[in-house]
Every structure is written in structure tokens, then in C-alpha cells.
Amino acid sequence: DRQTDRQSLIKLLQYVFGYAVVKLSDIATITRGGNFQKKDFCEEGVPCIHYGQIYTYYGTSASKTITMITQTAADKSKFAEPNDIIMAVTSENIEDVCKCVAWTGKNKIAVSGHTAILHHNQNAKYLSYYFHTSMFFSQKQKYAHGTKVIEVTPDKLNDVIIPLPSIAEQNRIVDILNRFDILCNDIVDGLPAEIEQRQKQYEYYRDKLLSF
């Protein structure tokens, strides 16, 4: 079928050129998150990620959640599967809209509203790192709308362009960025200027690794 032909073409381009330039819709199915609220949080229940936590707590990936919701709320919720990307699609500013986290836990989790869930079969951390680059930033600026509340709809996300190397190359890039990420974020002591410089170096090399 058409989708199988598209996947075969992507693999051929990856083999010949080392990567393929694809639309997000070529490699991912995008759905909206659920509708639970903070009042549904509880001590023991179903693990969840609320869209506000993507801005304030989570980094590029997570294997555990910091909150749970009641079973009643979960029964009406939407879920992210292991390896999915959870993206916050509304924000008060352009910098935070489309901030995302790769879910690397072993079980599915409930996801709140104001999110998009990206289901795919790529390296989730590779995609998450890409969604933090300046290349993606320029694209989301084009697709974002609103003034007080900025939004990028799942339909618009389908048109986002991504450079996609083979899974083996994605894994290699992720391994490098993971080590760089740890190096930057594990600094306990040091002058603020040094930490800021290290962060700039990390962002520079991340963008270089993810541009083809």
C-alpha cells in the first residue's frame, strides 16, 4: 500500500544518502491528549503526565512520572505508550510551546489535555532532541497561532520536516547527546558563567548533530 511504499522509499534514501528528509506524518501518528485536571491527582493510582509538568519538570525524556490520577479519571483519559512523544501544544509564549518529553517507561501513562501524543517506531530520544533544536523552533514559529495563548495544532505538526537517519545512526547521535546532557546537568559547583558557556556548547553541538 501507499504507506508501505513510503517507508520503503525512506529506507532507500537512508541507505543511499545516510538520511531522509521526511514529514512528521510520514513516521508518526499524532493524536490529542485527554482531559484530566490537577484535581484528579491522587497518592496511589494511574501514572500520568500533566501538560504543565512538561514545561516545569521534565527534560527530553522520562521513565517515571511524578503524579498519578484516580482510576475514574484514567478511564476517561488518553494514554501514551512506551516510546511515544508527549508534546505540550499550548503555551503563553513561543519558547515553551511544543516542548516535549519522550516517554521511555515500560507501561502506558495517562496524558492530559493541551498535548499531542506522537506514536512512532523511531528512537524517541532522537525525535525529542530534534524538537529542542533551532531548526524545529523556526518551523513551530511558522505554524503557531494566537496572542495570549500560543498553540500549534496536531494538524500543523503533521507538516513538520525532520532529517531522519537510520535507527543505528539515531542511536549513535542519542548516545553522544545523552553524555553531553549529563555533563551539562550534573554540574553541582561552578560559576554561573561556566555553566552558561557549557549549556551554549551543548546546544551548538546538539544542533550540529541533528542537521544534515
Task: Please provide the spans of the model-predicted regions.
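Amphipathic alpha-helical segments
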Residues: D1-L9, G18-A20, N158-Q199
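Non-catalytic DNA-recognition/assembly elements of restriction-modification systems
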Residues: K11-G34, E194-K200, Y205
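Short, solvent-exposed loop/turn positions at domain surfaces
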Residues: Y15-G18, N35-F36, A73-A74, T104, ...
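Short, structured motif recognition centered on aromatic/hydrophobic residues
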Residues: Y19-L24, V46, A80, D84-I86, ...
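Sequence-specific dsDNA recognition surfaces
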Residues: D26-Q37, G52-D84
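A short beta-sheet element
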Residues: H50, D75-H132
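A short glycine-rich beta-alpha junction/loop motif
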Residues: K108-H114, H145-S166
